[in-house]
């Protein structure tokens, strides 16, 4: 009841019909003058502007390194601020507080090497009534060069940014509307997914509900695996095994030929790549026949590279390090771009600027490099073997999702992470379900997009047009505030005409007549 009355008071405060819109806009525009309110948080407001209506082409931070402009979709107060984290480091952040603010905050993560403010989801979160918060994670752009010989900027990226932007953002909300958010949420994918679990492990009081998409957990092995995968296709030696887009189209068609119908229907989607025992040997050219043009078969070197790609990675002493690349990833354009004879940029930068030094010769890259990455593991960026007990005890909830066709982070990694948490906590799946659920999204690539029904409100670019579909932001709020957990995630196709229920792990998606249903392994 207390929260309901507080939210009602906030809505009255911000409702133009009650004559308070002018007060809100005045308070917003003068917020930068309230320096003393944020001194203890080392926070300086650099600009605060009230937007009475939607606006296009709004200047963004770091326009030459990230996006030049952004869009504001609802009336709101845009506050830009800097948090000093040391004598040589700082986080640049923004919080957008809409006039229809609901008393909830939404902190946002980032992607890749994470130096760009997520404006798309600032707009999305604020449009749904959240005070939306995002930062540049302590550096601008996607390069890892700022990490070189600077442990403070590295610490901002790994551990401090989400925590600090959230604390500062909540303080700004309190200064503007009179009280801190009644509920706090987080949403991020990829690096943002890793940040989600890092927050749950290390700062369990920050958030009531967390959405973690395709998390880049097991970070060192993930980036390390990409370096090794690239080496199979000539990135560190020669280009004899590079496969062009036409060749990857051949590979994709063979994958579908061998594995599409494993889920009971031929629809161009491999529902679960781990269930596909893909045999690239079927594509090898007969003795003495080259690949030719158009590509009709692959060379022995190319098939060998594929066999390595689709097998797990093991350490120097035979220990398991990381899953294979995702067999269910079939987009030939994406695959030809990824495995083009060049080292994956995040891997290259991490090795050069954090692990080995800028003069490292990648011809020396190998499993031993991955083991060095694991040994270094600054600030435990691996984010794999943590403890969710404090987050669970405080009543926190987690929705994790992962595209089954993800070409960047294998969905097998999310299963391994989930099972590691079950082991750490000593819980069975039905017990984990009480606070933590993992959903595997058939056909979806990295975070959004792909084939089939992959839109469920996980991102500002993936808002479903069919009202029968799920919205994962609504789902996490409903779980935290009403105790109603999602049994499935219902995704919608881009045109909204097709829906599909995506299952929570360890259930599996199985065709039952004309519809997919979720079933446990013993029932399949």
Please give the residue ranges for each predicted region.
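A catalytic-pocket lid/entrance helix-loop region that shapes and gates access to the active site
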Residues: 198-200, 205-316, 454-470, 474
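Cap/lid segment of the alpha/beta-hydrolase catalytic domain
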Residues: 112-178, 224-225, 359-369, 378, ...
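Conserved alpha/beta-hydrolase "acid-adjacent" motif
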Residues: 408-412
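Short beta-strand/loop motif that positions the catalytic acidic residue
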Residues: 400-402
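Gly/Ala-rich beta-loop-alpha elbow adjacent to hydrolase catalytic centers
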Residues: 188-192, 196
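N-terminal cap/lid subdomain of alpha/beta-hydrolase-fold enzymes
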Residues: 78-163, 190, 201, 230-235, ...
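Catalytic-loop region of hydrolases
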Residues: 14-102, 119-120, 265-266, 270, ...
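Fungal secretory targeting signals
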Residues: 1-21
């Amino acid at each position: 009841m207390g929260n309901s009355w507080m939210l009602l008071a906030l809505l009255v405060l911000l409702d133009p019909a009650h004559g308070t819109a002018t007060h809100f806009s005045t308070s917003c525009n003068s917020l930068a003058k309230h320096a003393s309110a944020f001194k203890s948080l080392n926070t300086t407001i650099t600009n605060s502007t009230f937007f009475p209506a939607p606006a296009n082409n709004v200047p963004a931070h770091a326009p030459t390194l990230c996006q030049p402009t952004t869009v504001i979709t609802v009336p709101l107060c845009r506050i830009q601020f800097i948090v000093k984290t040391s004598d040589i480091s700082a986080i640049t952040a923004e919080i957008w507080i809409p006039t229809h603010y609901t008393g909830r905050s939404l902190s946002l993560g980032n992607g890749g090497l994470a130096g760009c403010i997520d404006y798309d989801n600032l707009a999305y979160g604020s449009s749904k009534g959240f005070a939306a918060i995002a930062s540049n994670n302590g550096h601008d752009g996607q390069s890892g060069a700022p990490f070189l010989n600077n442990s403070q900027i590295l610490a901002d990226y790994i551990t401090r940014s989400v925590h600090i932007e959230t604390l500062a953002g909540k303080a700004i909300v309190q200064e503007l509307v009179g009280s801190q958010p009644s509920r706090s949420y987080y949403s991020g994918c990829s690096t943002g997914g890793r940040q989600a679990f890092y927050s749950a492990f290390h700062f369990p009081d920050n958030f009531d509900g967390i959405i973690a998409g395709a998390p880049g957990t097991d970070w060192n092995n993930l980036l390390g695996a990409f370096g090794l995968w690239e080496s199979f296709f000539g990135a560190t030696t020669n280009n004899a095994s590079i496969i062009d887009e036409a060749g990857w189209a051949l590979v994709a068609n063979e994958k579908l030929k061998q594995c599409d119908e494993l889920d009971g229907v031929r629809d161009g989607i491999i529902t679960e790549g781990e269930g596909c025992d893909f045999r690239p040997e079927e594509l090898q050219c007969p003795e003495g026949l080259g690949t030719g043009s158009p590509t009709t078969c692959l060379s022995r070197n190319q098939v060998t590279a594929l066999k390595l790609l689709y097998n797990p990675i093991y350490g120097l002493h035979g220990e398991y390090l990381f899953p294979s690349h995702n067999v269910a990833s079939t987009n030939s354009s994406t695959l030809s771009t990824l495995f083009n004879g060049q080292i994956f940029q995040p891997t290259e930068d991490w090795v050069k600027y954090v692990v080995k030094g800028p003069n490292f010769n990648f011809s020396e890259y190998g499993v031993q490099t991955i083991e060095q990455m694991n040994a270094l593991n600054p600030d435990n960026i691996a984010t794999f073997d943590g403890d969710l007990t404090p987050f669970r005890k405080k009543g926190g909830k987690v929705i994790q999702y992962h595209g089954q066709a993800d070409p960047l982070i294998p969905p097998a990694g999310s299963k391994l992470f989930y099972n590691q948490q079950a082991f750490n906590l000593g819980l069975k799946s039905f017990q984990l379900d009480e606070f933590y659920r993992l959903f595997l999204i058939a056909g979806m690539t990295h975070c959004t997009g792909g084939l089939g029904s992959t839109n469920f409100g996980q991102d500002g670019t993936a808002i479903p047009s069919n009202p029968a579909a799920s919205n994962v932001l609504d789902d996490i709020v409903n779980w935290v505030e009403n105790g109603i957990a999602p049994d499935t995630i219902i995704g919608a196709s881009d045109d909204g005409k097709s829906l599909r229920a995506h299952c929570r792990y360890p259930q599996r998606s199985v065709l039952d007549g004309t519809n997919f249903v979720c079933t446990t392994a013993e029932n399949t």
